[in-house]
A protein has these predicted regions:
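Short, Lys/Arg-enriched N-terminal segments with co-localized hydrophobic residues
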Residues: 17-28
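C-terminal functional extensions of proteins
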Residues: 198-241
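Conserved, well-structured core segments that form the ligand-binding/active-site neighborhood
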Residues: 30-48, 184-189, 231-241
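Conserved mixed alpha/beta catalytic, RNA-binding, or beta-rich assembly cores of soluble enzyme
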Residues: 108-180, 187-188, 194-196, 204
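Electropositive, gly/pro-rich neighborhoods at or near active sites that engage anionic ligands
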Residues: 28-103
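Generic secondary-structure signature for well-ordered alpha-helical cores
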Residues: 47-58, 71-78, 97-103, 120, ...
Length: 241
């Protein structure tokens, strides 16, 4: 400490130097940032993804789904963990553009919120989530099972083409598989992207082994945002074509 300098003054001096150094670094960071128009951000992001992602044997439709998932999560693991059943993307796209309408069933309101409503409306589609329905909650409590199980049973009563987009609950995929095995339901398409550690990997593999057209994020990664991203990637192949 300099002669005659008070401790409080020393603290102020050090703080001032720290702030100057920090502000200098902040200014450097700001100067290196790219100025991008809002409407160009997604295209710029996709260009970065294309430049950095590994090579693969995807069809153009599959590649669009992979890129959308990477874009959503900023995670290049989706270049290797996405499973597509034979002709899955083409089948889903044809269903969506058929004009018959379709219903997307999600297992979370987050996934429901993430599905692009403008694209959905353009394709005469709807999106449903039964998880928060009072009767679903009451029945699940009475039976001692998860709401995801009961919500899948309620969804089985829907008419018309149905796409299941499951991004959170492995029990939803397991119940779907059980009902499929019993002939109680035959989904038109399944998107399986639950995230987590308990029964997640196993539930996804059940769907991969089924005869229902599907897109599955194998392994532990996934989430409601990924389920919605897959839905949007499929719809955009019609609405943005």
């Amino acid at each position: 400490m300099k002669p005659g300098m008070h401790v409080d003054n020393l603290h102020v001096e050090r703080t001032s130097r720290f702030e100057q150094e920090r502000n200098g670094k902040d200014n450097i960071m700001i100067e290196t940032m790219q100025w991008v128009r809002p409407e160009e951000i997604e295209a710029r992001s996709m260009a970065i993804i294309e430049a950095e992602m590994p090579e693969g044997n995807w069809t153009p439709g599959e590649l669009a789904v992979v890129k959308r998932c990477i874009h959503t999560a900023a995670d290049f693991d989706y270049a290797s963990n996405l499973y597509f059943s034979d002709g899955a993307v083409e089948l889903a796209v044809n269903l969506m553009k058929s004009g018959r309408g379709f219903t997307i069933v999600t297992d979370t309101n987050m996934a429901l919120a993430g599905v692009n409503k403008a694209a959905l409306k353009q394709l005469n589609g709807t999106v449903r989530c039964f998880m928060a329905d009072p009767d679903v909650a009451a029945e699940a409590k009475e039976r001692g099972v998860t709401r995801a199980i009961v919500s899948m049973e309620h969804a089985a009563k829907l008419t018309g083409p149905v796409i299941f987009a499951i991004g959170n609950a492995p029990t939803a995929l397991i119940r779907l598989y059980e009902m499929m095995q019993k002939g109680e339901i035959q989904p038109d398409f399944i998107i399986g992207t639950p995230v987590g550690f308990v029964n997640v990997v196993e539930s996804k593999e059940l769907i991969c082994q089924s005869d229902v057209p599907c897109i599955v994020a194998r392994g532990r990664k996934g989430g409601s945002n990924i389920a919605a991203a897959v839905c949007n990637a499929l719809m955009y192949q019609v609405t943005r074509a």
